[in-house]
């Protein structure tokens, strides 16, 4: 059986933590950034967890991440 391919677009957008959580970058981080407060801009640099009800959509895209 051939190897499964990782979806490269998903690999660039999601990271898996050591405990198995799926992390994503926050939205609205580039466009009109200077209008936003500094505290909000700093929060864009942190990754946020993917909601547990959406993890099953990400798992098939990253077959070797787990």
From Swiss-Prot:
Keyword Signal among record annotations: no
Family: Belongs to the bacterial ribosomal protein bL35 family.
GO cellular component: cytosolic large ribosomal subunit
Domain of life: Bacteria
PANTHER family linked to this entry: 54S RIBOSOMAL PROTEIN BL35M, LARGE RIBOSOMAL SUBUNIT PROTEIN BL35M
InterPro entries: Ribosomal_bL35, Ribosomal_bL35-like, Ribosomal_bL35_CS, Ribosomal_bL35_sf
NCBIfam families, alphabetized: rpmI_bact (TIGR00001)
Gene Ontology MF terms in the entry: structural constituent of ribosome
UniProt cross-references to SUPFAM superfamilies, sorted A to Z: L35p-like
HAMAP family: Ribosomal_bL35
GO biological process, one term: translation
Record keywords, A-Z: Ribonucleoprotein, Ribosomal protein
Keyword RNA-binding: no
Stated name of the protein: Large ribosomal subunit protein bL35
């Amino acid at each position: 059986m051939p190897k499964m391919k990782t979806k490269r677009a998903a690999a660039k957008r999601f990271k898996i933590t050591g405990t198995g959580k799926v992390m994503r970058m926050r939205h609205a981080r580039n466009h009109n950034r200077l209008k936003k407060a500094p505290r909000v801009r700093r929060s864009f640099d942190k990754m946020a967890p993917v909601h547990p009800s959406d993890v099953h959509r990400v798992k098939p895209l990253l077959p070797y991440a787990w």
